[in-house]
Amino acid sequence: MAKKLTATVELMLPAGQATPAPPVGPALGQHGINIMEFVKQFNAASKDMEPGTIVPVVISIYADRSFTFIMKTPPTSFLLKKAAKVQKGSSDPKRQKAGKITLNQLKEIAQLKAKDMNTQDLDAVMRTIAGTARSMGIEIEGYKG
């Protein structure tokens, strides 16, 4: 018989740098999960990623207090800021541009994000990411969406 799922917790954690401090401790502690065990498993699973990369993680908690987790790709905004080498997006994206990325960088981000999207069409993923870039004030050189 399959384990009974009791809760699902979604967190955004830095790769390889999770600690039992908030937000991990309180989020998992209230469900009776061994927090250190999760921290060790998460840090081991994310050790190959660049340190500090924000990683969304979905933790499934079962009735017997065991858990499984799925790591997703970093948020699109994080990848765009990293590619454009900016700290944050523009507060007024129509008038003020925060930075620029190339068409190749857009394609790389789209290929990385494709597995988390609800489509496998790379052009559709690129359009979605271009829309996010536009709303952040990041210009894409050579892209006519």
From Swiss-Prot:
<keyword id="KW-0699">rRNA-binding</keyword>
<dbReference type="InterPro" id="IPR036769">
    <property type="entry name" value="Ribosomal_uL11_C_sf"/>
</dbReference>
<comment type="subunit">
    <text>Part of the ribosomal stalk of the 50S ribosomal subunit. Interacts with L10 and the large rRNA to form the base of the stalk. L10 forms an elongated spine to which L12 dimers bind in a sequential fashion forming a multimeric L10(L12)X complex.</text>
</comment>
<dbReference type="InterPro" id="IPR020783">
    <property type="entry name" value="Ribosomal_uL11_C"/>
</dbReference>
<dbReference type="InterPro" id="IPR006519">
    <property type="entry name" value="Ribosomal_uL11_bac-typ"/>
</dbReference>
<dbReference type="GO" id="GO:0022625">
    <property type="term" value="C:cytosolic large ribosomal subunit"/>
</dbReference>
<dbReference type="Pfam" id="PF03946">
    <property type="entry name" value="Ribosomal_L11_N"/>
</dbReference>
<dbReference type="InterPro" id="IPR000911">
    <property type="entry name" value="Ribosomal_uL11"/>
</dbReference>
<keyword id="KW-0694">RNA-binding</keyword>
<dbReference type="GO" id="GO:0003735">
    <property type="term" value="F:structural constituent of ribosome"/>
</dbReference>
<dbReference type="InterPro" id="IPR020784">
    <property type="entry name" value="Ribosomal_uL11_N"/>
</dbReference>
<keyword id="KW-0687">Ribonucleoprotein</keyword>
<dbReference type="InterPro" id="IPR036796">
    <property type="entry name" value="Ribosomal_uL11_N_sf"/>
</dbReference>
<dbReference type="InterPro" id="IPR020785">
    <property type="entry name" value="Ribosomal_uL11_CS"/>
</dbReference>
<dbReference type="GO" id="GO:0070180">
    <property type="term" value="F:large ribosomal subunit rRNA binding"/>
</dbReference>
<keyword id="KW-0689">Ribosomal protein</keyword>
<comment type="similarity">
    <text>Belongs to the universal ribosomal protein uL11 family.</text>
</comment>
<comment type="function">
    <text>Forms part of the ribosomal stalk which helps the ribosome interact with GTP-bound translation factors.</text>
</comment>
<dbReference type="Pfam" id="PF00298">
    <property type="entry name" value="Ribosomal_L11"/>
</dbReference>
<dbReference type="GO" id="GO:0006412">
    <property type="term" value="P:translation"/>
</dbReference>
<keyword id="KW-0488">Methylation</keyword>
<protein>
    <recommendedName>
        <fullName>Large ribosomal subunit protein uL11</fullName>
    </recommendedName>
</protein>
